Design a protein with these regions (language model features):
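A structural signal for well-ordered alpha-helical segments within the folded catalytic domains
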Residues: 27, 47-51, 130, 134, ...
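Active-site-proximal alpha-helix that buttresses catalytic centers in soluble enzyme cores
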Residues: 1-71
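Non-transmembrane alpha-helical segments in soluble domains
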Residues: 30, 57, 133, 137-140, ...
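Active-site metal-binding loops of divalent metal-dependent hydrolases
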Residues: 9, 170, 224-226
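Beta-strand elements within well-structured catalytic alpha/beta cores of enzymes
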Residues: 2-6, 42, 159-168, 172
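Phosphate-handling substructures
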Residues: 61-145
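Acidic, low-complexity terminal tails and accessory targeting/binding regions
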Residues: 73-93, 146, 150-163, 174-244
């Protein structure tokens, strides 16, 4: 199974929608995904994600399935906080204070148990990660891939050659992919990021299926790929901040 995680196009947050640039990005992305096809489309309930998915769905004749648990505002409640360097609530992965704390020896040493740190006792980190992990596990189990909570590998109950596209967000995506890849959130959210309309491709490949004890591990084949923008002559400007 190939899993495509796609961040929405260039957004207007209020009212929730895409900019004209975001609409062009979504159209370019649809052409890229149509090249080899997509079998199913899942999408956050936010308008900007829905509008990003729409051109792909139309081009391929697919009906997207909306997943309310992937909407950004739920993740914001769990992972946006005030800190000494921000008077207003802010994503923790964009806060110098939390970036330092997340990468401290104490937090790194806790690994998957990082939410047990006393300094996070008054946050919603534990609830947020537990919620997203539960929904993520249920989602992939519905596709035939069941996660082992100890090893982070997957048992394949129904082998699939499907190509699955999931259109959602940056903040949600950092928590979501950390759950898929068994990489603690403090490390993942401070070392990886998604551009507008970017495509991350993960292969759920099963190894040694003919043997008694096969294993499936999700492997990232591409991360935050925006080649569709280059192909269509659109600006490849990450977060409207830097060209590369």
């Amino acid at each position: 199974m190939l899993f495509f995680y796609i961040r929405h196009g260039d957004p207007i947050y209020t009212p929730d929608s895409l900019t004209p640039q975001g609409e062009l990005q979504a159209a370019a992305l649809a052409k890229r995904l149509a090249l080899y096809g997509i079998d199913r489309i899942y999408v956050s309930s936010s308008v900007r994600a829905q509008q990003t998915a729409a051109p792909t769905a139309k081009l391929l004749g697919l009906e997207p399935e909306t997943l309310d648990w992937a909407t950004e505002h739920l993740t914001w409640k769990d992972f946006a906080l005030k800190s000494p360097d921000h008077k207003k609530e802010h994503w923790v992965f964009q806060s110098a204070y939390f970036i330092r704390r997340f990468n401290s020896p104490e937090i790194r040493a806790l690994g998957a148990n990082w939410t047990s740190a006393p300094e996070f006792a008054d946050t919603r980190f534990a609830e947020g990660i537990a919620r997203i992990q539960k929904e993520t596990d249920a989602f992939f189990a519905s596709l035939g891939y069941v996660r082992d909570p100890v090893s982070g590998t997957y048992r394949v109950e129904r082998p699939s050659g499907e190509r699955i596209a999931f259109f959602a967000h940056q903040g949600f995506g950092l928590a979501f992919l950390s759950c898929i890849l068994n990489d603690p959130y403090p490390h993942f959210c401070t070392h990886f990021d998604f551009g507008h309309s970017s495509m991350t491709v993960i292969e759920f490949r099963e190894y040694d299926r003919e043997n008694v004890d096969p294993v499936c591990v999700p492997r990232v084949l591409q991360f935050s790929n925006d080649s569709h923008l280059y192909r269509e002559g659109l600006p490849t400007k990450f977060e409207n901040r830097i060209f590369f």
